[in-house]
Amino acid sequence: MDMNNPTPHHNLHFISQCFIKPHTIPEESKQPYYLSPWDLLMLSVQYIQKGLIYSKPPAALNDDGQFIEDLLRKLKHSLSIALVHFYPLAGRFATISYVDEGSCLVYVDCNNSPGAKFIHARLDMTISDILSPTDVPVIVQRLFDHDRATNHDGHSTSLLSIQITELLDGVFIGCSINHSLVDGSSYWNFFNMWSEIFQAEDDNFSISRPPVLQRWFPDAHGPILKLPFTNLDQFITKFEAPQLRERMFHFSPASLAVLKARANTEYKTNKISSFQSLSALVWRSITRARGLSPDQTTGCRLAINNRTRLNPPLPENYFGNSIQAIRTAATVKELLENNLGWAAWKLHEAVVNHDNEKVRDHVNKWVESPFVYRMEKLFDPLSVMMGSSPRFNKYGNVFGMGKALALRSGYAHKFDGKVSCYPGSEGGGSIVLELCLRPEFMSVLEADEEFMNATTPRDPLHYY
């Protein structure tokens, strides 16, 4: 799939768009909403774009549009209620420049904004057209708003955009949220709470996991954190993905148990997790597929939640970014000549060693010398990045159409070696990997016996 050429467009029709404001205006929303170091780090990367695909109820297939009309009305109303709790998502970024200091302050203005964006579109394709192909069709990118936008664009574009795309036999709910406001935990908590409100049909419903909007800042710093920039070109860049293929690979609970047992047996331990074993398999397999020289250094990075690693810990529902990418590395020769257990143990060590001291040290260094992440530097053609998490509640979001059939993502954060980890739709501990590679590397991976034998063959009657 050529990530830079999202064609053909098929017949995607944009029917309408509007902006949704909070149903009632919280008093706190009248104050500036300041960004933490973890939030500011994300200004030059892209929005989080995830979406769920649902089957239309049988009665909706020939009802002259009444079902979708009712669905849109309920989605808009429940979204307005959700935004009372998650009011920063209805705001816009604002910047104060301190030219004499050579610095600027970026924050969220929750007051002077039209609200969150809501789009209704129609696509003349079926669920099978989207989910059956071996590779994820490029049309999926167009099921999300804010395509290729950076988070800094949130000064002029909505921080949250919902695109509802009606298919011939289904509905795709695409949600784009500014990554300088949320990480994966906050993103899915918003999605989950919106679903709760939709199902409750009660404006006064008490959500089960209200977001904790109080900001976290390192000791003796904040809430005002200035960036040492005055011009956009000093810290904001656009990233264009190379030509890629994108595939979904399914791993059953039984297959993951075998991988875990193998890794622990090989390293003579019982501490390696299923996910660490799977990540080691992916790292080794992609490294083989790339045909790298034995003396080259390859790395594997894991996105890790800092909430529970701080002391004292942050609340589980802390709203905002609280993540880091931890990395382990080896020469290609070391990685491939040693076994799966050796690679999995290196990942295990990186995880267990990421503690309160490491987290605070990283943040304190940022305070001393602020910077932002740049996509082109996050992209390492010799390494693998494991993002998202199979622990997030991605299939508990019900919007009057039953359980979602599958999850797909947009253009954002795709590069060679990027892997996003999702729970399998059937549950039970299964995992689906969304894996992006250059076409020539994907072809080799598809012929890799160790990797493919660990996957579950595609079932034409079951999507993932």
Model-found features: residue ranges?
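Low-complexity, glycine/alanine/valine/leucine- and proline-rich hydrophobic stretches
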Residues: 379-461
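Short, surface-exposed beta-strand/loop micro-motifs that present aromatic residues
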Residues: 41, 159-165, 416-424
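Terminal membrane/secretory targeting segments in land-plant proteins
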Residues: 1-25, 45-46, 77, 457-464
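Detector for long, low-complexity, acidic/polar
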Residues: 34-38
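A signal for specific C-terminal beta-sheet/loop modules enriched in small/flexible residues
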Residues: 2, 125-134, 449-464
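Soluble acyl-CoA-dependent acyltransferase catalytic core bearing the H(X)4D motif
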Residues: 15-17, 25-31, 44-45, 49-88, ...
